[in-house]
Amino acid sequence: MAKIFLYAVARQSDATALERAKSLINTSHSIDGVHPMLSLMVPLADDPFGYVPGVSFERPSFVIEIAQPMGKPLEPAIRLLQPQLTSLLELLDRNKTQVLAGYHRAFKVTGKNQLIYHYLMQKKAGFRSVDYLDYYANNHCQFGIATPGIDYYQTYKDAEFTHELAQRWGVVAATAENVSEMHMNDVNELLHGEGIAEVSRGALADEELFVDRPNSRMFTMQLIARRTL
């Protein structure tokens, strides 16, 4: 599955921009057999993962996800949604809004989706993208699979497409190498699930090998709308 994340930061009113984002999700219509899957998420006000603001990544007002099924290109979906996206972008701070496009892979799926955790991960100095992603996809993913109480996904960035979209929309290209996604119905399942302490220790130790943790960003969101056109 190919996917785009738009980490939207409102220029003035979060509420006004969010209403326009809801309109994009709820009023768009399929044309010529193009059926993108759209999702809208808002960060939790009391996020237990302690989002730390940073110069490189502003806390988003909301996040829009645009996805196409395997074998279906994203470009027709973008053309379909472009009028609504253009209207939405007028309300966003384009110097803080970021986009990331990539290949989405499902590792563990049971249908949990009320809360969605994103971890935008940066590679450690000395690692090329190929080095980083090779280690992640073939080794580090074991910790996400072993985490109890969650569904687990990865989106690996397509740097060329991400930069192209950033230029097209006048926003910032995300510098993260990937987005680690954990979906859950209750954040306590992740915080206090049986065996989570041991998995967390192993994951943190492994990340020290290849992840630039101080410049990576994590936060949890509430899914408020999802629709396939």
Which residues does each PLM region occupy?
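Macromolecular interaction modules
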Residues: 1-229
